Amino acid sequence: MAEITASLVKELRERTGAGMMDCKKALTEANGDIELAIENMRKSGAIKAAKKAGNVAADGVIKTKIDGNYGIILEVNCQTDFVAKDAGFQAFADKVLDAAVAGKITDVDVLKAQFEEERVALVAKIGENINIRRVASLEGDVLGSYQHGARIGVLVAAKGADEELVKQLAMHVAASKPEFVKPEDVSAEVVEKEYQVQLDIAMQSGKPKEIAEKMVEGRMKKFTGEVSLTGQPFVMEPSKSVGQLLKEHNADVTGFIRFEVGEGIEKVETDFAAEVAAMSKQS
């Protein structure tokens, strides 16, 4: 077995753009023959995947699955809406979802490692960067899910509710985007930040500090209601709050998770005309 030196790994990285561990693995399998390692990496799609790795993957799908009292929600990203609808991409996302449910896997790095070879092969086939971005689980007495297309997914856990009510609550979460279950769940940090914002606004209106503080107290009660599930008007019957709806059914929500494709990812806007002009200058 030939010695796999650091300089050899470095050279392969520079020539292929692949990661250090992938380069070391390829060189080991090729017994130190760098040309053979490159050839094998080309065949496996590893080089193409490495070149696509820097591309921003902000599109994709949200998948949900419930197995009894256990549910998983998953986001898998690609670069375009076109690929998000591709049968091969959808099948890959479904396979990752099934594995997460079966193994109760909530560590995204574990999923990434488990499906890396399949991901690389799919990148080579499709021609876009693909990323298993995040996964989360929810447990409860009664679970419900809702998906708005493939772009928004919600899991809701409740006690004392039937499946229809939980489904309606999941639809509400998808539409209204609450951040907490109840007003009292809003963290002190979030409350303090909003309090300072509202106090600054009130003070800028020229009100004395004592009056401004009383005004803000009223606004803060409204704020904690707006960002919490039970404090929001129920989307299907806005005359009552979700909290009132739950009270009528003698039910309680114990948790929810809402994923939306690409949230928090900065998507690069491409100027097609400028891109074509740049390419023509290079040719």
Swiss-Prot record:
Cite the entry's keywords alphabetically: Cytoplasm, Elongation factor, Protein biosynthesis
User: Which residue intervals make up region (Involved in Mg(2+) ion dislocation from EF-Tu)?
Assistant: 80-83
Tell me where it resides.
Answer: Cytoplasm
Primary subcellular site in the record, as a coarse category: cytoplasm
Query: Which SUPFAM superfamilies does this chain map to?
Result: Elongation factor Ts (EF-Ts), dimerisation domain, UBA-like
* Gene Ontology cellular-component terms listed: cytoplasm
GO MF, any single term: translation elongation factor activity
What is the role of this chain?
Associates with the EF-Tu.GDP complex and induces the exchange of GDP to GTP. It remains bound to the aminoacyl-tRNA.EF-Tu.GTP complex up to the GTP hydrolysis stage on the ribosome.
Family recorded in the similarity comment? Belongs to the EF-Ts family.
Q: What is this protein called?
A: Elongation factor Ts
> What species does this protein belong to?
Citrobacter koseri (strain ATCC BAA-895 / CDC 4225-83 / SGSC4696)
Origin organism lineage: Bacteria, Pseudomonadati, Pseudomonadota, Gammaproteobacteria, Enterobacterales
